[in-house]
Design a protein with these regions (language model features):
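Conserved N-terminal substructure of TIR/SEFIR domains
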Residues: 1-60
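Conserved TIR/SEFIR loop-to-helix hotspot centered on a Trp-containing motif
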Residues: 36, 63-69
Length: 69
């Protein structure tokens, strides 16, 4: 099933959760790593597949995200 992929840094995890909850309340499906990843499977494999299947990618660009680069 297609979804909105939410990209964020670890510090914005709670914001990603709130955005996912909002999107899902509006009838969309959301995917973010902390909730939807499968333990034991590579981060790169999981996120790559989730992005490939996404109908949209939402980037959370916060001060923490900018500071991480």
């Amino acid at each position: 099933m297609s979804h909105v992929f939410i990209s964020h840094v670890e510090e914005d995890q709670s914001l990603a959760r709130r955005i996912a909850e909002y999107l899902e309340a509006q009838g969309y499906r959301a995917w973010y790593y902390e909730r939807d990843s499968v333990p034991g499977v590579s981060y790169l494999i999981q996120t790559g597949e989730a992005i490939r299947r996404a109908v949209a990618v939402l980037l959370i660009v916060s001060p923490d995200a900018i500071g991480s680069y």
